[in-house]
Amino acid sequence: NIAITYAYEPKQIAEEISLITEELQSRTVDITNMEQQGIDGNTDFNFNPVCVICDEIILMKLVFPDKLYKETLAKINAIIVSGRSKNIYAGLISQSGLAEYFGNSGIRGNIGLKVALGQMSASEYSMIFGTEYADVKNLRYGEIGSGLIMRTGLDSRPREFVAPYIKNHALD
């Protein structure tokens, strides 16, 4: 079963995030019950995957009422911090890596894949990849889809990344 929901109004987005947070809580209860029945906690519990993609997190901060933004961001943070073990994932897309758009900067340490496309400032690279990588540079700046990537558990530091470029007529 695959369900795709597209929400674009602040209230709709908040409702969808709330539903995913409820699913996260439900799976937490399910795991606790299974562990009490003697099922190993390191087992794959075969939960269907759930992915939430928050495109343009900056825009959320700008258009959401302040209280709704803070509540929604707290729920997104909860998904990022504890969702992976329950097969629930969050993707945050932003044109800026500045901390003011991501709330609690502690969530950045829990993000498993970080991609920075284009050329960013040293402070943005520092906020995305960590202070020890403030000096990294995208050497292919100007090339469409070029940037840096860092994958938790696979990369020891940001490395070059070029996203595939698909021309519109190639899809015809």
Residue spans for each PLM region:
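A generic structural signal for short, solvent-exposed coil/turn residues
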Residues: 44, 82, 141, 152-155
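Conserved P-loop NTPase motor module
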Residues: 75, 107-115, 143-172
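P-loop/Walker A phosphate-binding loop and immediately adjacent motor/lid segment at beta-alpha junctions
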Residues: 131-147
